[in-house]
A protein has these predicted regions:
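Short S/T/G/P-rich N-terminal loop/turn motif that feeds into the first structured element of a domain
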Residues: 13-82, 90-96, 123-126
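Histidine-centered active-site/metal-ligand motif
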Residues: 30, 101-104
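Bacterial N-terminal signal peptides
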Residues: 4-15
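Short, exposed beta-strand-loop hairpins at the edges of beta-sheets
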Residues: 96-100, 108-116
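A common structural junction motif
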Residues: 53-56, 103-108
Length: 126
């Protein structure tokens, strides 16, 4: 019985330790929601996701992930967008540098803007 309790306690501690640590003070989360000009077009969606992934090479980005909207019946959830991008920067300065980086501007002008009818950005600072 002691062994079972000991194992249960160990597993509980391990599961708590697997949570991501809180973001550091001064970091910025950059959230981009994109509505496609041709909603549901798989080739366009793939091009948008690939363009987002290419941005990983830009310095100052601590985290980048992109995906599609999760359908929801909850009235509070806005699932009307097609592609979402979440990024974390180590500072406001890094975000500002990213915004003017030629690689970012190229993807915005050659892929994101031409294939998007709407783009909404949220920046969250800690």
């Amino acid at each position: 019985m002691k062994l079972i309790l000991s194992l249960a306690a160990s597993l509980a501690l391990i599961s708590c330790a697997s949570l991501a640590p809180p973001a550091a003070h001064g970091t910025v989360d950059h959230i981009v929601l994109i509505w496609q000009k041709r909603p549901g077009n798989a080739a366009d969606r793939h091009a948008l996701l690939a363009a987002c992934a290419d941005l990983r090479a830009i310095p100052g980005i601590k985290f980048l992930d992109a995906g599609t909207a999760l359908a929801s019946d909850r009235p509070i959830v806005d699932d009307s967008f097609d592609v979402g991008l979440t990024m974390r920067f180590d500072s406001v300065k890094s975000l500002r540098t990213y915004e003017t980086d030629p690689r970012h501007l190229k993807k915005v002008n050659e892929v994101l803007k031409p294939q998007s009818k709407r783009i909404v950005v949220y920046d969250i600072m800690r």
